[in-house]
Amino acid sequence: MQQLQNVIETAFERRADITPANVDTVTREAVNQVISLLDSGALRVAEKIDGQWVTHQWLKKAVLLSFRINDNQVIDGAESRYFDKVPMKFADYDEARFQKEGFRVVPPAAVRQGAFIARNTVLMPSYVNIGAYVDEGTMVDTWATVGSCAQIGKNVHLSGGVGIGGVLEPLQANPTIIEDNCFIGARSEVVEGVIVEEGSVISMGVYLGQSTKIYDRETGEVHYGRVPAGSVVVSGNLPSKDGKYSLYCAVIVKKVDAKTRGKVGINELLRTID
C-alpha cells in the first residue's frame, strides 16, 4: 500500500503536466487501483482510529488525479445520455451482482464509480459522488445528495432533499462525516467537514457549516464544526451583543442516549423540545 501511495504522491506533484494523452502506465494503473479500492470499500478517505477521525489525503489526491488522466466520454443511461470523466458505479452490474452486494437502488438514483455502498442500504432517487462511503443499513432518501468523499455511518437516515457536502479541494479540508445512527431531517445541509456525532437527530431545515454556531441551550456552550453525540438539533437564532439583530444558529435542545432514542420515535423527540 505504501508503494501505491508513493506513486500517487509523486504524480500529484506534477499533476499540472499530466493529460490523458501523456499519462504514464504506472500512474494510470495506480489511480485506477485506488478508485477500485474506494469503490469496493477496501479503502476509505476517512476512518475513525482510536476515537479520532483521520483523513487520508493521498486518497483525495488519487481522486483528483483521476480527473486529469481521463477524457470525457459518452455515458449511456436509461433516461438520457451523459458526458463525463467518471463512469457510473452500476454500469456493468447485472442482477446477480446486485443480489450479492445486497443494496437497493431506485431509479433514477446515480452513484459515481469510486463511491462505496454497503449492504442493506437503500438509495431512493438520489446522488452519491466519487470517494463517498455509505455504510450498512442507511437510507438515502429522495433528492438527497452525498458529496465527494463524505462519510456516512451505519443506520443513518438522510431525509428528502438533504445535502451532505463534498470536499476534494483544498486538500487540507476534511470530509463531512455523519456517524452511526444519525437522523438528518428533510432539506438540511451539512457541509464543510462538519462532523455529526453518533446518535444525533437533526431537525428539518438545519444548516451546518464550519462557521455555524451550534448552541447548547442547557450549558450555554457554543460548538463549531461538530455536533456532540446524542444531540437533538433544531434551527434557531442568537442575539447580537448590542441586541439590535439576531443571526442564524443551530440549537441543541436536548441530549438523548441510545436507550431513549430506541424507545422514542424521531418525531416525538423533535416535538417535545420545550
Curated annotation (Swiss-Prot):
UniProt-listed Enzyme Commission number(s): 2.3.1.117
Single biological process term from Gene Ontology: diaminopimelate biosynthetic process
InterPro entries cross-referenced by the UniProt entry: DapD_Trfase_Hexpep_rpt_fam, Hexapep, Hexapep_transf_CS, THP_succinylTrfase_dom1, THP_succinylTrfase_N_sf, Trimer_LpxA-like_sf
Stored Pfam families: Hexapep_2 (PF14602), THDPS_N_2 (PF14805)
Source domain of life: Bacteria
GO MF annotations, alphabetized: 2,3,4,5-tetrahydropyridine-2,6-dicarboxylate N-succinyltransferase activity; nucleotidyltransferase activity
Localization per record: Cytoplasm
Keyword Translocase: no
Matching Gene3D superfamilies: Hexapeptide repeat proteins, Tetrahydrodipicolinate-N-succinyltransferase, N-terminal domain
HAMAP family: DapD
Subunit structure: Homotrimer.
Protein name: 2,3,4,5-tetrahydropyridine-2,6-dicarboxylate N-succinyltransferase
Taxon lineage: Bacteria, Pseudomonadati, Pseudomonadota, Gammaproteobacteria, Enterobacterales
